[in-house]
Amino acid sequence: MSRLDNRAYYDDFAGWYEKERHLPYHRMLDDLEVELVERYATGKAVLEVGCGTGLLLHRTARFARHAIGIDLSGGMLQKAQARGLHVMQASATALPLATASVDVAYSFKVLAHIPDIQGALREMARVVRPGGWVIAEFYNARSLRRLIKAMKPPSAVSETTHDEHVFTRYDDARAIRSYLPPELTWVATRGIRVITPVAKVLEVPLLGTAVRWAEHRLADLPGARDAGGFLVACCQRR
């Protein structure tokens, strides 16, 4: 199967990107991610790497001192700009920011699609001040989500494109550690989507409420968090 380059893929995806983001599953993921960023970024200068249409950046800007986003896709950024956000078009492996210019750099659902993951993490570490934080999310190779994704057909992201048209990498904790530059120390972990088997579960009355409650409590629980479909490494910059 031929793959699209990342810019073309996300430009094509831009039209449909927010089509289902109002549904309970996506709201839960967004809440778990923003809640984590808020722990580290309140009152700080923050960068989102791969901000897309600005759904998370818009929320981050409410508690950050200054929030900026970068994305490879001009199509995605048009929507972020319409939200009044400070965004720039750039690659995660060549960030257009000065060294040690932000307190926190975070990235969700992006790094798994970047072949040069070590280059992207080096850049995130470069722009963060000593003592600051890099919050990096990876797709967990050892998770229920990974198993289910392997069994189901591709998901459409536009009329002509599906999610197997883009490079995707799944990692375990050992691989993630091997990607980190020496100036980053992995301090904390959050697991997102620990027990949710399929997105539709969150739409079932009562059951959806119970699953959401459990996901919020399992996200930081040692052992359980390691099974999250998404593993978030919270790394401090030395």
Q: Residues of each region from the PLM?
A:
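Conserved class I S-adenosyl-L-methionine
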Residues: 1-41, 44-52, 55, 59, 133-158, 200, ...
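Class I SAM-dependent methyltransferase SAM/SAH-binding core
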Residues: 53-94
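A conserved beta-strand element that flanks and buttresses the S-adenosyl-L-methionine
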Residues: 106
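A short glycine-rich, Lys/Arg-flanked "PGG" loop and its adjoining helix->strand segment in the class I
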Residues: 118-130
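Acceptor-substrate binding/catalytic loop of class I
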Residues: 155-175
